[in-house]
């Protein structure tokens, strides 16, 4: 099956900074947000660019 979720939120954080944190730097961010649950992360494919 396919799960679809759509949401719209407002934030005082600039869109570019929010995108960078949530998608480009998520491997670093998730370790800081959930240090008790995430020991380490590793990008195994791709370089984040085109």
Swiss-Prot record:
Keywords: Allergen, Pathogenesis-related protein, Plant defense. GO terms for cellular component: cytoplasm; nucleus. GO terms for biological process: abscisic acid-activated signaling pathway; defense response. InterPro entries: Bet_v_I_allergen, Plant_def-hormone_signal, START-like_dom_sf. GO terms for molecular function: abscisic acid binding; protein phosphatase inhibitor activity; signaling receptor activity. Belongs to the BetVI family. This is Major pollen allergen Que a 1. The lineage of its organism: Eukaryota, Viridiplantae, Streptophyta, Embryophyta, Tracheophyta.
């Amino acid at each position: 099956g396919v799960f679809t979720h759509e949401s719209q939120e407002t934030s005082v954080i600039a869109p570019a900074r929010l995108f960078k944190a949530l998608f480009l730097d998520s491997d670093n961010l998730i370790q800081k947000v959930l240090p008790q649950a995430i020991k380490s992360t590793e990008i195994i494919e791709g370089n984040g660019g085109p």
